[in-house]
Structure formats: C-alpha cells, structure tokens
Design a protein with these regions (language model features):
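Short S/T/G/P-rich N-terminal loop/turn motif that feeds into the first structured element of a domain
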Residues: 1-66, 88-93
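C-terminal structural segments of small proteins and small subunits
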Residues: 62-89
Length: 93
C-alpha cells in the first residue's frame, strides 16, 4: 500500500478546503481523506490538518502522482493560498 501524506501546520479555511477536496478526489486510482489533527502523545501536535491519498499498489501510486489531476491539486492549493504543507510519499507493508 502507498500513501501521499499532506501535513499542514495551520488549518486551511474549511469552505475552501471542501472545494479543494472535491478536486483531490478526482486523482485516479486512489482514495482521498482529510481532517483535523486532534492531538499528539507529547504536548501540542506539530500539525493542525492532515490529508492523504491511499493507493493499493506501487503502479497505481506512480501513475497517480504523474497524472494531470494530481498536478492540478498542487496548483489549486497554491492559488487558494493554503499554508504550504509538508508532503511525503509512504510505502506501507
């Protein structure tokens, strides 16, 4: 299983992010989820908001991150003025 994790230090505007999430859900081959970070085991969490795409396998992941739809999500987030996120790619066993 592969994931793209998107971590925001500050929570984006809820209405604008709901519109952005619709675009994110169009990335082929994956499932998109997002929500507030609610805590951490040691003090305040480092991030306020989390989003992810989940892909069943490497082929679906590689295809998705090269897709026009995936590229459009980054452009849309920038145009909306969302706080710059940390984006990481994960392989899970």
């Amino acid at each position: 299983m592969y994931r793209v994790a998107v971590l925001y230090e500050h929570e984006p505007d809820a209405e604008a992010y709901a519109e952005h999430a619709e675009l994110c859900s169009q990335v082929p081959g994956g499932v998109f989820r997002h929500g507030k970070v609610t805590g951490s085991p040691m003090g305040d969490p480092a991030h306020a908001y989390y989003a992810e795409w989940e892909f069943a396998d490497e082929q679906a992941f590689r295809s998705a991150i090269r897709s026009d739809e995936f590229m459009a999500t980054g452009k849309d987030a920038y145009k909306r003025g969302f706080p710059p996120p940390t984006v990481e790619f994960l392989e899970l066993s």
